[in-house]
Amino acid sequence: SVPLVIEKIFKTKIHPQLTANAVLRGLYRIPFVRKKLHAVAGKKLLKTFGGELRMFCVGGAPLAPDVELFLREAGFPYAMGYGLTETAPLVAGTNPGKSRYRSTGPALPGTEIRIDRPDARTGEGEILIKGPTVMKGYYKDPKRTADAISRDGWFRSGDLGVFDNDGYLYIKGRLKN
């Protein structure tokens, strides 16, 4: 699902109930209380999806940090993914319980991801992708293909990212539109 779906549910239904009055807003600011409130709300949310949901996939745009925090603390079975049309579509992702806050997860098997020209201070650079799902080129557009795919076959995503020490990818923004 695109993040907008779960964000709308959280921001219009769940969060207003958890912060409905001054007392609840005060309690919500206490981390261990917030976690308990999120756990209760997460169970209710799971029931609205039929109670049998094993995985709720999120991708297509960044997930709002407060919504991801809710999903984590609620124990909601969500999984993050990253990909592009040109990569048919998924290149990195997680399974429920394996996600890391703000990360799209590690590269999928058979897919290589590297960071091009990483910044010396932050480690951020353009995300390059290589693998069997990466397109061969843009239809009848050799100039655009040459701009997007390096001579050695790496697709230039135009996205900025960085890896953690365990190979989890974090999207940091756009290099180009």
Regions found by a protein language model. Give the residues of each.
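Gly/lys/ser-thr-rich phosphate-binding loops in alpha/beta enzymes
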Residues: S1-K8, L175-N177
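Alpha-helix N-cap/helix-start capping motif
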Residues: P3-L4, P31, A61, P132, ...
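Gly/Ser/Thr-rich phosphate-binding loop
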Residues: E7-S99, E112
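Short, flexible, glycine/charge-rich loop motifs used to bind or transfer phosphoryl groups or to couple energy/partner
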Residues: K43-K47, L69, R102-T104, R117-P118, ...
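Active-site glycine/GP-rich loop and adjacent strand/helix microenvironment
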Residues: A61-P62, D66-E73, P89-N95, T104-P109, ...
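Conserved ATP-binding/catalytic segment of the ANL
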Residues: A107, T111-R114, R121-N177
